[in-house]
Regions:
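N-terminal nucleotide/polyanion-binding subdomain common to many enzyme families
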Residues: 27, 126-161, 167, 175-176
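Short loop/turn microsegments at loop-to-beta-strand junctions
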Residues: 31-33, 44, 156-157
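Small-residue (primarily alanine) positions within well-ordered alpha-helices
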Residues: 16, 20, 57, 61, ...
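Short, basic/aromatic recognition patches
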Residues: 10-26
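Zn2+-dependent cytidine deaminase-like catalytic core
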Residues: 37-138
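Conserved small/polar residues in nucleotide/adenosyl-binding loops
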Residues: 159-166, 180-209
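N-terminal glycine-rich anion-binding loops that anchor highly charged ligand groups
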Residues: 27-40
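Short, compositionally biased leader-like segments
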Residues: 1-15, 128-133
């Protein structure tokens, strides 16, 4: 039976989610992720993922905390990654730093992670829990989650009406990794009653926590 989350757990996870939001428009194709390290009720380090290829949220928080990370609890908006990409696995960094507990808002659906991050932490003796404020965490990365789960881009269709000649224009917006930060372009019109077209955008690539 899992241990219920405390009021403090909710507070610090909400903080991690707010940090993750700072990656809006910059993390593509990676997901937006925030991390808060807490020891004895005090925040000792925090961070958020800024751009693909740059340090992940957990690594930034660990660097800020230094030795204070030992025995701390890490609140992460997405399960720590467990695979080697352009950056090393965050799960290994948390273990090496001596973090005692990891709370993830949700598990990472990326096939390269898919529970392996939390499993590796648990096997190393780190207490793990997942599912705190999960719905809010999912809202951060609709494009990334759709790609990982269905192999499809996240697309938003917008309509606007030109009152001058009552023509309707459409704009297709294709979300990338964090989903939702990249967009498409629009078409233009010509003289003498000429027409225009909509534009579109797409996303690709994988992501890490």
């Amino acid at each position: 039976m899992s241990t219920p989350f405390s009021a403090a757990d909710h507070e610090f996870m909400a903080r991690a989610l707010r940090l993750a939001e700072r990656g809006l428009y910059t993390t593509d194709p990676n997901p937006r992720v925030g991390c808060v390290l807490v020891r004895d009720g005090q925040v000792v380090g925090e961070g958020w993922h800024r751009r693909a290829g740059e340090p992940h949220a957990e690594r930034i928080a660990l660097a800020a905390a230094g030795e204070a990370a030992r025995g701390a609890t890490a609140y992460v908006s997405l399960e720590p990654c467990s695979h080697h990409g352009r950056t090393p696995p965050c799960s290994e960094g948390l273990i090496a730093a001596g973090v005692a507990r990891v709370v993830a808002a949700m598990r990472d659906p990326n096939p390269q992670v898919a529970g392996e991050g939390m499993s590796g932490l648990h096997e190393a003796g780190v207490a793990t829990q997942a599912g705190l404020l999960e719905a809010a965490a999912e809202e951060l990365n609709p494009g990334f989650l759709k790609r990982m789960r269905e192999g499809l881009p996240y697309v938003c269709l917008l309509y606007t009406s030109d009152a001058a000649d009552d023509r309707t224009w459409g704009l297709l917006w294709g979300g990338g990794g964090g989903g939702d930060g990249g967009g498409g372009g629009g078409g233009g019109g010509g003289g003498g009653g000429g027409g225009g077209g909509g534009g579109g955008g797409g996303g690709g690539g994988g992501g890490g926590g």
